[in-house]
Amino acid sequence: LLFRGYKDMSFPPPPHGLLLAGGCSRRMGKDKSSIRYAGTTQPELAAELLRSRCAEIFLSLRKGQSNATGVENLNVVHDRRKSAGPLVGILSAMTEHPEAAWLVIACDLPFLDRITLDNLLAQRDPTKIATAYRSSHDGKPEPLCTIYEAHARLVLEDFFANDIRCPRKILMQTEPLLLDP
């Protein structure tokens, strides 16, 4: 069975990790990536979670943004488009590494843990556009703790071109694998 370059669908290659830290933090008034939780910054905590689970880890930043504190050693993907938002970061990473699936997490998820990520990876379905958790609050997809498969890029590009730039809305209109928390 061949599908998008994978020879054995039961063992897809590990995804790249993408830590989204390019937001402007307008509501918070300061860069979210500088906030400390349990003595360390959010990007440091998130990068540590991704380290043993991903082939490579990348930090997504907006154009002109300096690297986040504590993760200066990560590869950086700068937004390739003027438009803001997490979809731009995801598409920028997918454009730089089109063959890779991406485990995408936001930098401001202080309660994200290894069990949650391990379950997401164990349940991953590479034949779907994405594997995501379903929100326990409203049942909708949680797009910022999701594995986006490499073949999702063209679908995401199409939504972007049609001015649909909210990853949650995109997942609601496609058929990702949704996991219960």
Where in the sequence are the language-model features?
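Nucleotide and nucleotide-moiety/phosphate-recognizing core
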Residues: 10-167, 172-181
